[in-house]
């Protein structure tokens, strides 16, 4: 497997507005309630690594609208996909609007991974312990399953050569499906009646509160592989950890959200918004 990532970041940026690509990227058969593009599912170990690194405020949940014939549970009067009558979800990385210019385009405000340097279009945590397993191996799992990669979508709609070698890596982590994924990549919220009013609506419009996100991140961190069980003490500790987190990521997301529409989309703003708050640097391209 070989890819050309320079000046791309198609897997990290919601670039649909640049190429008139209206369809929503989907992972699995059910439609996500949110509209976040290419939200990468984190494993339980990934989630714990982010919490250990003091980056819990970078994480957000995804829930799915239930199909008529699929298991579901009512939350806020809406049927959401469920596992044993518990809302099913995974955890990904938040995508605030950032000024980016992929594919040699003019700068634009686009939803972008919280850890992507808007100027170099490189990941700020690429060599860190919390770098997600799925990101490290992308697009290996897609190639192994014969599923279209984001590299190929960019080639089709923008042009250029991004996927240079489509042979799946000989060694990569095991794919998690069905029961294998429960408690490890797909989680079950144990007490849906405890969810605050309006949560599903806030999720749909991308306006979750810190408390909303912390509830789900804590459940993921306290889950056990292969089961819907959640360890109460670990859950409470993780919840408090997320709420107490005040990282450069969370502060930068707040400023990006305030700046969108007010400032010209200059990728160089990343220095003032992220680097000045302690964001790790990126090497640039040789």
Describe each PLM feature range:
Residues 1-286:
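Short loop/turn segments that flank or connect secondary-structure elements
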